[in-house]
């Protein structure tokens, strides 16, 4: 077979013969470089890629151009086209742009794109939380009871908690004036802060869907699919979209629950504070308090050791035998302060900031006290 192929290639005018002849001539004329020679050949940097000394450019660093990436060969024709007109975004100045959402006085449309990723559509959750059905309460009772018992076992039996002023929290949950909402605020050191901290409460509270708190949970962590969304929804968690400001359905729903006299728990830091630094509190809690039809009771709390119970590192396993300290502070008496803000018609963005600042001041004192109590246990 090989001889037949070679004889055919030797025929005059054969295309394969002409191609073979060209390849042989190219190899003979050293047009081909063996791989070993190519590897041994010394590397020479291209002239256009060599850096130019900065002394040739007396301007600032921002005015200098990167010659290595913008050098144009002299043989390339110049582009004589006129410059393109400016885009609409370039023609706008800062005075024509709308103010940020946190500084607006009216509730803007929630349909405005925010750039926040939405892994799962949560729009269907809010109507069910706003007007719960009888079926919702039945399922919620099972979920709340299961989570409450689990939290109590983990906190009270598997670890070593110490709660200061526990009766104060229980009294405000069960015996506050009818119709007056309760807003508890605390630091956020662990993903198990809620519901783990509520394991210190009696079973009559922690396993009662009518008495247990409403709480906001991150939409991109807790509400990522239908199953998780159902679980947290029946657990009285409200999906909050972090990064779109205080005017959103989660804050609106908290205000509605406050109008009904319910208990609402807020982590005003807005995230798990793994570094334990003093963060500026988010103003959403200020809006809930200021816009509530009835001024709520504001109860600050501080805890230490929850990040030891459930560390913020993999494999995220609940630990045993850890010391946890929960300190329930004094209720903040802001009634006169809030009434004065409303009487003077202080703009809502300013009012909610002033209220949040009051909570931040209470946090500083409560944190120092709780850290001291926690150190004394060790």
UniProtKB/Swiss-Prot annotation:
This is Tafazzin. It comes from the Eukaryota. Acyltransferase required to remodel newly synthesized phospholipid cardiolipin (1',3'-bis-[1,2-diacyl-sn-glycero-3-phospho]-glycerol or CL), a key component of the mitochondrial inner membrane, with tissue specific acyl chains necessary for adequate mitochondrial function. Its role in cellular physiology is to improve mitochondrial performance. CL is critical for the coassembly of lipids and proteins in mitochondrial membranes. The HXXXXD motif is essential for acyltransferase activity. Residues 46-112 are annotated as: Disordered. Pfam families: Acyltransferase. Residues 51-67 have a biased composition (Basic and acidic residues). GO terms for biological process: cardiolipin acyl-chain remodeling; cardiolipin biosynthetic process; cardiolipin metabolic process; inner mitochondrial membrane organization; mitochondrial membrane organization; phospholipid metabolic process; sperm individualization. It is a peripheral membrane protein. GO terms for molecular function: 1-acylglycerophosphocholine O-acyltransferase activity; acyltransferase activity; O-acyltransferase activity; phosphatidylcholine:cardiolipin O-linoleoyltransferase activity.
């Amino acid at each position: 077979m090989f001889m037949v192929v070679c004889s055919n290639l030797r025929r005059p005018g054969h295309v394969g013969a002409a191609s073979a002849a060209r390849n042989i001539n190219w190899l003979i004329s050293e047009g081909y470089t063996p791989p070993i020679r190519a590897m041994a050949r010394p590397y020479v940097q291209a002239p256009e890629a060599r850096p130019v000394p900065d002394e040739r450019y007396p301007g600032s660093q921002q005015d200098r151009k990167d010659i290595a990436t913008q050098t144009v060969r002299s043989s390339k024709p110049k582009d004589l086209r006129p410059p393109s007109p400016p885009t609409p975004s370039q023609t706008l100045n800062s005075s024509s742009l709308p103010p940020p959402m946190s500084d607006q006085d009216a509730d803007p449309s929630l349909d405005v794109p925010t750039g926040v990723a939405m892994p799962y559509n949560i729009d269907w959750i809010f109507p069910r939380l706003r007007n719960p059905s009888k079926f919702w309460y039945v399922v919620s009772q099972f979920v709340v009871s299961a989570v409450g018992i689990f939290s109590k076992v983990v906190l009270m039996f598997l670890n070593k908690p110490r709660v200061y002023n526990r009766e104060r929290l229980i009294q405000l949950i069960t015996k506050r004036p009818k119709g007056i909402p309760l807003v508890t605020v605390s630091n956020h050191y662990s993903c198990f802060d809620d519901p783990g901290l509520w394991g210190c409460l009696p079973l009559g509270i922690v396993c009662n869907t009518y008495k247990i708190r409403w709480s906001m949970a991150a939409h991109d962590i807790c509400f990522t699919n239908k199953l998780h969304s159902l679980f947290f929804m029946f657990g009285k968690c409200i999906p909050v979209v972090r990064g779109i400001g205080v005017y959103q359905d989660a804050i609106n729903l908290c205000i509605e629950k406050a109008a009904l006299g319910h208990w609402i728990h807020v982590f005003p830091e807005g995230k798990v504070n793994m570094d334990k630094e003093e963060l500026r509190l988010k103003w959403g809690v200020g809006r809930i308090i200021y816009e509530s039809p009835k001024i709520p009771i504001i109860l600050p709390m501080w805890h230490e050791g929850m990040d030891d119970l459930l560390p913020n590192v993999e494999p995220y396993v609940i630990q045993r035998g850890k010391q946890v300290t929960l300190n329930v502070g004094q209720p903040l008496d802001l009634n006169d302060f809030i009434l004065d803000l409303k009487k003077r018609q202080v703009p809502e963005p300013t009012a909610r900031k002033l209220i949040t600042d009051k909570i931040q001041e209470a946090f500083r004192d409560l944190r120092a006290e709780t850290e001291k109590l926690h150190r004394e246990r060790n």
